């Protein structure tokens, strides 16, 4: 699969066929696609997320969709958000090594990121809902935030590098808009998209 192919969403059934020749993925899980076990584990609103296990390891394959996953194509979103996620992850890895999954491959045309599978890690939200005690969470999040925010700031970066970062991420309008509205604004008033406040 190359970035020049028309976008096509992956599925559990098509992933091995479409990514079986991807050297980055095969180098982490093995080339024999008949031994690949593919599970779709995405529990979010926006992306497809697969765990792919093979003879020699496992990886995560994440693909953006051109719409909000839980709503459908009536709420379109640009695929370029995977471009911003890829660049954010590479910067976070450089600024706070070991704090985010390693990136194995990025295909901009397919809005696809292949990354390290961090087992037995789980999504933080799940641990919090289950009431798990996480004694190091404040320290770990604090260190990650301090390292990435300071090392990505004017105080640490060369001016030309900082301006290049600002220019790169300035076009990430749609995903920022969703976060700002759906997470920080809409839950607190009778917003048009809120279903729980409708009769």
Named regions from a protein language model:
Residues 1-38:
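Juxta-kinase regulatory segment immediately upstream of eukaryotic protein kinase catalytic domains
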Residues 36, 101-102, 164:
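Residue-level recognition of the N-termini of beta-strands and the immediately preceding loop/turn
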Residues 31-54:
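ATP-binding glycine-rich phosphate-binding loop
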Residues 50-160:
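ATP-binding pocket architecture of kinase catalytic cores
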Residues 1-15, 116, 160-199:
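Active-site catalytic-loop/activation-segment of kinase and kinase-like phosphoryl-transfer enzymes
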Residues 23-25, 64-68, 150-157, 189-199:
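Short regulatory "switch" loops immediately downstream of catalytic or recognition motifs
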């Amino acid at each position: 699969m190359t970035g020049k192919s028309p976008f096509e969403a992956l599925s559990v059934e098509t992933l091995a066929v479409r990514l079986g020749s991807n050297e980055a993925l095969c180098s982490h899980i093995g080339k024999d696609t008949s031994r690949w076990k593919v599970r779709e584990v995405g529990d979010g609103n926006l992306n497809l997320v697969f765990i792919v296990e093979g003879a020699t390891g496992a990886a995560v394959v994440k693909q953006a969709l051109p719409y909000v996953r839980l709503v459908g194509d009536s709420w379109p979103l640009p695929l370029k958000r995977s471009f911003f996620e890829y660049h954010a992850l590479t910067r976070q890895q450089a600024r706070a090594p070991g704090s985010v999954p390693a990136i194995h491959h990025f295909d901009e045309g397919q809005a696809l990121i292949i990354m390290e599978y961090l087992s037995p890690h789980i999504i933080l939200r799940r641990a919090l809902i289950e009431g798990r005690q996480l004694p190091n969470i404040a320290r770990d999040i604090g260190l990650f935030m301090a390292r990435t925010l300071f090392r990505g700031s004017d105080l640490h970066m060369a001016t030309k590098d900082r301006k290049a970062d600002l220019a790169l991420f300035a076009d990430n309008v749609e995903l920022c808009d969703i976060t700002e509205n759906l997470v920080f604004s809409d839950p607190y008033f009778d917003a048009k998209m809120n279903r729980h406040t409708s009769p």
